[in-house]
Each structure stands twice: as structure tokens, then as C-alpha cells.
């Protein structure tokens, strides 16, 4: 076999030029492919622009579940009720979107209607470019959740009710029944080559079955199908009146008792008007009456380049002029209402170039905007309106032409706004005015925040110049303005209203042009309303550090009203070793809502001393250290005069003089002879001389140990000699425990002095001091716990407050309902016959008059306060834990003393206190109970609710509540899935854990994030951290 080299070659090698041309050819093919791809993407972008135009309008609904009440007046858009609520809702929506990720696209909002069902709000949102409905909805929900509007303090919105509907141009066109299938069904058709073509979603085949185009390109006035079938008059004829393309110099279209959408979808009737090139189109509305949700949009032009010029619903807009020979009219039908007659529009063509300057300018706005044009490059549009605008603190109450509510005028957008806006109105091009002419007009600039009105002239040859300008508040009246025009080239006049964020409407009426120079005005030149003083700083210019001799300070603006939402700090200082006395010379605050809090020391380690509110006078406050912090905190409502205070420093201010060595000092500072201490008879007015006369020590629990008695300030150990069971019971009861359980003699290892106990004939204990016990025998006493934490009413087990169930009567006999000024506000737990444990935040600012509080014990149904099981007690003392910090929500616990001791019954029993620092492990199931809200921001319960919740570790709780600092003084409980939780109104109530058939108070309901959300547990004050503090009040 010969080699391959011996076979003659049938191909020759390519030359260098041939290789070069081949490479170039490949590159050109690649470039063509890239250009095709880019063109395709560009076409798709154009299609999208065609669908949505230069601006985008979305319609939304939401439900107000509290903060406003529905009434029939809300159906009347001219009523004060409608205007007030619409203003506040628009303010809320504007606040949210102007602080959102869509703030650059967002323009404004408009409330259309209120419906019953709590209150359902229907509104429109306008954006200057297309945004997805999903994105709009997400931003709105996030803004409400983040409380991005001050209106959300008042309104509570049902987040699940929020819905944003698709934009106008996404709806299908309604056609007559004979042709509707062509627009609503995409069917594969056979091409001449027997090739079946199926269009992608949102596209349809042209009639030639060779090309697919976007559905939105059908019936838009521009030919997109090669055969023109997308604009076929039969295909596009509307179901409203059977018309589509209108081409005469005059004609009409209508939607009389217009058809309703089917299958719960919205629909559109669309008309295209074309007149001769160079002409414009005037639309006269013979009648117009549509439901608020059914909107007629008027566009200048057609197809992808059309510009939205007007959105119309409900009321007759008068005459609309479009300065183009093409108009697209699109009627969006969303409702199924049948009580509206619809509309009829007659159009005529006219030549705007035949108008003179006077015809182009003169306008009283009674029939529309005349020949004035909205400046679409600005932030918003002028509104044609009549009657008063809302709120009444800005804008006119009537027009200038007629001087009553029947006449029309134009105004910058009424209602709230979240940013400054420029709103422009332009003339058509005007002819030069060498003979001079006088432009006159009437303007209305009223409101504290009104900004500026400017009139400018512009031309192609010269830069824009300002010929008239006013700034500020000129009061509640129409003012006359005039300026002479003297232009040598074609020019335009523009009116610009500059709108501030709120309460800043500017109105115009009766614009006219007359021959000749302006004469001296017979109307007086308006004067500015004095500007109100600047807003006061909410921090009072602080924080302030004060030392002697600079010892007097006041709330800001005293004796005039202080600012709302203030948070002010004064740090008072004294030399080391001294303390501080704070005195309020004058004191007048809004009761409860505005407070002055005084703390001992500075910073996080400072201790709570007092909180004052309402009218004075108030008591002096003394520090125990050389520093004192004064906090002034106000809400966003009513403001009063405030306060004037001073302080002095010294040694031992407010501290009683110490007693002599042979005296005992009572808690109130009184001195009594030492021999009277622990003698069985109270000599101190506060009973403190008999409060701590017996104790247990060296025991394994707080209910066992050796017994000690205090005799004249010296502790004596009890001997076992003569000890009896009765003495055990007596000593255990003196300790605040139950009966004696056992007493065992034990050998003494020294450490006297000692005391022998005997029982007197009257049953009292006789104490005899001794230097030694008989046979060195001491008594080791074990007491029973006092009866507590026991349910005495037999009940069935109920199934597993929010997510809870009605409890049975007597199920939780220690749960107490707290009323302030006869309003049920919080819960509490009974821990003895005369003391309750509750939350500090419940009584904060409400502690100055304890008698305004009452406790209802044995309550089951809040609506039945006459039940025989109930006992009601007034409160005569409130003690807030000195470590409580309201801002950090730490140590949120307080004691409340009943004016009269309560009797224990089957329905009234105390709950047990846990051991000091007792541990309740994570995962343990405990119980909560209360009459609080059944859902977040909902109504409170009538029947006492109960539920079980698992405890969480503080580490996990911190992860789930990252915005709070979860301290060792807190315990958390709740399910990861949510659904069960304490809520508003449950504050101060118990978190209860069962142990050894007794219920222990493990926590006090403190705070949470809303109620029962997933991974959002409730947070409670951890009671074992406060057991010793609580017990100090009980014994």
C-alpha cells in the first residue's frame, strides 16, 4: 500500500487574502447577529413603552380597621368628612412613597372613593414611568409596617387588604360579540407553507398568519401588522358604541350605559381620532357621569408616542383641547355598577394657528383650561376645581369670576404632598407684541407653608426670564396681579406654582390680555401675613449640664406652649459627697401623655426616682448621689405651658438626721427607743420596727433553717428547749410562710447570743435572752409554703390573649384586672392579701394619684362587674422598680398596694413567688392569661383568655427581636410559627409556670412586636430577678 503522500492532491491551499476574507466574513456574521439581538431587545423595550406610555397610573385598595369610622357622608366627595379623611390618607400614602425606593418615580396619589366595611379606600397612584404593581404593593406594605407616616399613629391598616390593580394599558379591548374572538383568543393558524405558527404569551397573529405582535399593539392607531389587520376598523370597533377610527372634521363617540366587564376582568373601549395635518382637536362633553372606578383617559397622539393629557371620571370636565391632529381616547371599565349613564363626546377640528394672543390667553376656566397647556415636564399638574379646597387652612373657598361655589378656578394639586413640586401652565406660542399688552390675572396664596408663584416668558431666541413673582402667605383673599408684555419675537408665557410639602395650595383665575400698557392698579398691593415663629427644637437645645450657680431651668418656650414630640435632658451636678434637691416652681403638663422623669445618677445605671405629669404642684425630689437626670418627654398632641424648676446642693438633703445610739430609726425618719424594737407592738407609724424581727438562716431553702429573733437590734439564735408545734406554726406565720412542717433539735457550734421561747397564756411568744442553750441544742425549723398558686375551682382541660381560648370561671384566681379612671387598661397578679405585681409601664405617668386606680379581683367577664365572686379594691400606693428604664423597657415591674386587704375565696387566691433567681428552662410550657386584644390593634376580650406558650432562651429571643436589647431581667415566650401571644391590654398580667402542683409567677407581661407574629415572641419581666424586692413589701 502506497503512502498518502503519493496520492495526488485534489485541493489547493488557500491564499493569505482568501483566509483574510473568510475571517472578515465570520466577523460580519457575528456582528449582524449581535445587531439583530440588540434590535430585538430595543423593539421589546419599545413595546413595553408603548404599553405603558410616559407615565403610569395604578389603582389600589386598602382597609382602615381603626382610627376612622365609616359614615354615609363619606360617599359625597364634596362633604367635609370625605375631604378630611381623603386628605389624611393621601398624606399617609405620599409620606410612604416619598421615603420609599420608588420616591424618584412617584408623583402623587388621589383618593377616589370610600366604601363601608370598616373603611375601604380606593385610590390612584401616579408614577412618571412604569413600575410593576407587585413593586408598588410591596413598597406600600413595607412603609406601613415601618410606620413611615405620622398618620399611622392614628390609622391602623389591614395589610392583607392592600391590593394594587394592573395599569390601564394592560387590559384587553372590548369588541362587539361578532369580532371579540379575534382579540381574545390566540389560535395557531396555517401559513401558506402549511407551517403552524403559535404566538408567545401576550402576543397575537396578524390576519396574514405570518407575524405575531404584542396584544397591546392592536387597535393603538399605528400599523404594526404588514397587512394592517391590527388596526382593522371591524376588529377594533368598541363594544361601547361600535366605533373605533374617527376621521372626519367632526364626529362623536360615546359610552351610554356602557357594557360591564365579564369574568371579573377589567376592559377597555378605545377610539382613535385623526383630523387633517396641522389641525387640533376640541372635545366637548355633552354629558359625563361615570363610576369613580371607570376612567376615561385622553391622550395626545397615538401608539407608543401618545402622551396622557387627562384622566376623567365622575364629573363633567368641560371642554378639553388637544393641540395635535391625533387623539387616543381609552375608557377603562372596572366596575359592574349600573346606575351611571356614561358619557357622550363630540369632537371638532380647529386651527390653533388662527387664534390671536388674546384668544390664546383669556380664560376664566368655566368651560375648561381654554387654550392653556399643562407643562408635562413638571412635577405635577394644575387642577380645575370649584368650591373650597381641603384642608381649609389653605386655598380658596370660591372662585373669583362668580365669587361663589358654582364657579371654577385652577389650583396646584390640593391635598397633602410629601415634597416640593413645581406645577407649570403654558400658553401656545404667542405673536410678538410691539404695541405692548397687559397680562392680568387673579391669584390666591393662603396658608402657612405657601411657597411661590412665578410668571415667566421664554422664546427660542432668548433665555427664560421671570416677569412676576410672589412668595409667602397673602391671606384669605383673591389678589390682583398684572404685568406689561413687550416682546419682539414669538414667545410663550408660563405660570409656575411652587408647592411646599403640605398646606400650600396656590390658585389662579380670570387670566386675560388687553391692549396697551398696564395702568396703575386700582387694587391695593397685597401684604404678607406675618410668618409664624420657627418650630421649636424638640431636644430643647440640649442635653444640658447644669452646675451651681446656674441652677434654674425651664421647658423650652416657657411659659408658652412647649413643642410636641420633645425629648429633652438636663444633667444636674453637685460636688462629690453632696446630693441634690430638685424643686418645681411651676408645673403644667398634658396629663399622662407628657411627663417629667427624674433619675438618681446619670446614664444606664441611674435609678428611677419619680415621674410627674399633669398640673402641679409636685413634690421635691432628692438624689442619693451627686448627680441627677431630668427627662422631659412629650407626645404629638396637646401642649401646655411646661415647667420652671431649680435645684440646690448640699450634704444629706432630704435625709433625716440619724438617731442616737440607743434609738431605732423608722423608715420615715422617726426615732424610737431601741427597747421598743421587735417587742410585739408597733411604735413606728409605718410599722417598720416590727417588720423584720425573725428570720431563718443556714437553711437549704428560703423556708428552712435555724431561727433567729432580733432583740434591740441584736440577732439571737433560738434554743430547742420548750419548743412546741404551736411555736413552729407561730414562727412560720411571722415569716410570712405557712404552718410548721417539722422542727428538729441540732447541736450548737457556738455563735450566740441565744433566746428561749415560751408561749404566754394569751398565745403570744415570750422571748428570754440567754448566753447558752440547754445541752447546746438549737432548733432547725422547716416551714410549709403558704397556700398559694392553687386552683380551688375544678375545671376541665381547655384546648390550646391572641390565639387563646375562653377560660373557665375561677381558672386563674390570682389574675387581676386594673382600671384607671374606670377604663380597663392592664392586668396584675395577686401575691398577698394586699399587694399586686404589675408592669411599670402600665403605671408610668399614672402613679401620682393612686386613688384613680382600682383593682377588680375574681373577675371572669369584663362586662359583668356585679358578679358575686368579684371584689373591688382601690389602690393607695404605687411603687415603680427603681431600676426601671422606660426607653430600654428594662426592669418593667411595679408593686401596687390595695387600700383594704382582700378576702381569699375559691375565686381569689394569691400566686406563688419563685425562689430568688429560680431558673425556668427554655422549652418549658407555661401559661398566660388576660383580657387584652384578640388580634393586633383589635378589640379587647370580654371573657378572660388563656393560652400556653413555650419559653425561649434569651439568645434565641435576641435573634428574633434584634431591635431590642433582651437583658437578663427579661424572659421570652412564644411559638416560632406565631399565632399565640399576649397583646395590648394584657400588659402587667402573669406568665405562669406550674411546679409541684403550684403555679409560680415566672414573668410579668411587658412588650412585644405587634402580636402573635412568627418568630416574634412576647417579652416578660423575669420575676425571679425581683423576688427579693417583691418580698420586701410583703413581710
Curated annotation (Swiss-Prot):
Residues 54-169 form the SEA domain. Its main location: membrane. It is found in: Membrane. A lipid is attached at residue 2 (N-myristoyl glycine). The chain crosses the membrane at residues 19-47. Residues 2-18 are cytoplasmic. This is Enteropeptidase. The chains are derived from a single precursor that is cleaved by a trypsin-like protease. GO terms for molecular function: serine-type endopeptidase activity. The active site is at 841 (charge relay system), 892 (charge relay system), 987 (charge relay system).
